[in-house]
Amino acid sequence: MSDYKKTLHLPVTKFPMKANLTQKEPEMLKRWEQTDAYRIMYSTGATKEPFVLHDGPPYANGNIHLGHALNKIIKDIIIKSRNMQGHPSQYVPGWDCHGLPIEHKVEQQLGEKKKTLPAHAVRRECRKYATKYLDIQRKEFKRLGVMGQWDNPYLTMTPAYEAATARELVRFMEKGSVVRSKKPIYWCCSCETALAEAEVEYHDHTSPSIFVRFPMPDARVAEILGTDPASTSIVIWTTTPWTIPDNMAVAVHPEFEYAVVKNDGQHYVLAAELAASCAETFGWENPQTVRTVTGAALEGLVARHPIYNRESPVVLADYVTLDSGTGCVHTAPGHGREDYETGLRYGLEIYSPMNDEGRFLDSVEFFAGLNVFEANPKVIEKLAELGNLLAQAKIKHSYPHCWRCKQPVIFRATTQWFISMEANGLREKALKAIRNDVDWIPAWGEERIYSMVENRPDWCISRQRLWGVPIIALLCESCDEAWYDTEWAAGIVEKFANHPTGCDYWFETDLSQIVPEGLVCPKCGGTHWAKVKDILDVWFDSGTSFAAVVEQREECSFPADMYLEGSDQHRGWFHSSLLASVGTRGIPPYKAVLTHGYVVDGEGRKMSKSIGNGIAPQEIIDKYGAEILRMWVSSADYREDVRISEEILSRLVDAYRRIRNTCRYLLGNLSDLSAADLLPVGQLESLDRFALDIAMRAHKRVQAAYNDYEFHKVYHTLHNLCVSDLSAFYLDILKDRLYSSKADSKERRSAQTAVYHILMLLIRDMAPVLSFTAEEVYSYIPEALRPEAVTVFALREDDIPPMEMPAAEREDWEAFLAVRAEVTKAMEPVRKSGEIGHPLDAHVTLFMDDALAAKLKATGADLRACFIVSKVTVAPLAQAPEQAYTSEELNGLRISIAKAPGQKCERCWIWSEELGSSSEHPSLCPRCTGVLCA
């Protein structure tokens, strides 16, 4: 018996079956650098409009986490896919380098030493810290296979960037939008600074809940309420007892009904709808409602503060609700936005007598020196002592906490710098831009940011810290009046731009060189000045990146095509960027905003140290390779929260292996093919043209998915193409033709041509996601076949020949696929019975009606080869024997399966009745004999 296996054209390739990604990926990164693959990618075949994706800067603090990886990989997929579609697109990564987290870390490192160091020395340490971590993060991002201008990123701490940020402040000043005033803002007593809404997180917190009576000695009580003022009180409810010392009024709703409830000789005013529940809370045994009045009737009555001998008038406010409490709201204008607005309306004092640590000043009787949370029990104790505490309890509720130190924050009125939302119509313009000028992806993002902008207060842009861009203004030391002049401020900005460390100039330079000569305070005539010590909100820093980067870098153009970050940035970077741009340019800085969800564990829980369910990107890279992380990003709909677990990663590894093995098989069948051997698509065998049609339509679906940012569709389309359309169908059929036919025969070259085009489509579609693997596959394409492009990322759509079938021809092939599926079903019981083993042992007879037979004939397919059997006979439906399989899916089809006649060819394993046509090869079929004797 001859060893005919050696005569078969089995797949040959050096492309390894085992990916060995953890070792191979670093080698590929070096290769990309050596070949300048990134530059080649964006400069090759740039025939369409450029696409600008502007990077939201991550914070230069700590190692990257999976949220960073998700974000950067999505951006990389977009940049690569846009370039490969002919849209030149560069990626300019950035880092947010200023702000509280870095300053905190530096304070911890410096300890007591910080108190003796000048501001610029502390800032120098902050700069070093930020530089250290941006270098660490840069390496980690590059390891993910993300391409970009890594050697020329934008940093918010460079002189040029700091000057650009300060310049935007001056623009707002020129428009009259910048104001300095005393308003309640979020305040962190631990960090001793104002906080933006985006810097506040909500966590469960247990607070004291108290009901307090305010005596109403006003003589008009007798007339309006019909009660003795000496026995009448108005009742409030609060969960912040520490604000009671700062109470200035009690607010009621003008349209609500308020009851005067008598109990045990005393009269209490509260909302009629809540009277019964309050009476139960207070333990009143026999309450009686003696009168009801509207809230409007109560306006102007004067209550007495429950602790101090001062007045607390009754005022009206539409924000009062009946959801809980008493319908009468304790009002402290120094500790709440609505309270503040009510205070302005009624001329109440904006009273907030505490220092930056949140401790009451010495002027506050009974509570001096206590911080707000220490004061809570003391206030309750004092109220009880004075007989004004009606009830107390504990309540667990969602409460604002500092994003950095995780401590509860307070609302506190302090003198801060604001950008007015009403001056120059900023709110109205921003809302109009949200509706008309931006594509929000997903669409729900539009309503989210719209409601935030619609309801937000003025933008507090000042922070009481060191590490940031200073607010360019002076303070009169005599009267605390602020002064700035836009021409003077613009001159300071240029100093920042030309200073080696940017706005360190403000902190290093002597005051005499900052203050204009002879400057006199316009308010008091004072001549002694101090620099403003506050710095700009870091959200103003990053929010002006459009001015520092998008408008300045030659790789970019304003407005950017896209901003892309996590969904929390509707109140963060998207928000501040929108206000900064609309406020100075009149238009948003972006045409589209795309958001992704958070990374959660396999059960949908947030990653948490306390749960211990966190996974670092490096762990996954070390175990599986970055390619699996990239595949994970593309496998899920990132617009929702994205799950990750060992089980999910294991499934992805299996899917990756199937895609890789498909690529390897395709490569293996190209080893003896050159570009000159490729046949025109129109001359290919019908099955090969159908396979190309399948691959081309998959390619178009993939490209549409890239355009629509639906990368999960890319993953599923590619996986299904490899597993179902190729491995389980086309390549399975093709084996006989590729292995057994004459090497240079037309039928084999037809198959190889199709395999080549399918592989080229596949690696094009893979490259934005499976970048390492696509490049590796491309490098293993035989040199005689490989295009001139140095990198897979230089391949373009223009290089693809037309490969789609006419619709009518495709319909015939789809009918064939349906028949093939029925043949497989019909064969199952015959194989189970042992009558035949391998499908090649079978003789299939198709009994079909004329219409179905005509469709199969129209395909021109070799049915024997396509069904992977040894013989196929087609007969009229009427001739079908009674025992023939009847298709439930296709009308007009019955199938008989029998053992193939003849003997099995030793070379191709197909059964033939014509074995032994050559005495030299007596065990071969005529086709195999012809191949060997040619």
UniProtKB/Swiss-Prot annotation:
Please tell me whether the keyword Nucleotide-binding is annotated for this protein. yes
Sites binding L-isoleucyl-5'-AMP sit at: 565
Q: What is its EC number?
A: 6.1.1.5
Q: Where's the motif 'HIGH' region?
A: 58-68
Sorted alphabetically, the Gene Ontology BP terms of this entry are: isoleucyl-tRNA aminoacylation
Instruction: Cite the entry's keywords alphabetically.
Output: Aminoacyl-tRNA synthetase, ATP-binding, Cytoplasm, Ligase, Metal-binding, Nucleotide-binding, Protein biosynthesis, Zinc
GO annotations of cellular component type: cytosol
- Write down the required cofactor(s): Zn(2+)
Q: Which gene encodes it?
A: ileS
Identify this protein by name: Isoleucine--tRNA ligase
Q: Please tell me where ATP binds in this chain.
A: 609
Alphabetically, the GO molecular function entries are: aminoacyl-tRNA deacylase activity; ATP binding; isoleucine-tRNA ligase activity; tRNA binding; zinc ion binding
User: Any note on cofactor binding?
Assistant: Binds 1 zinc ion per subunit.
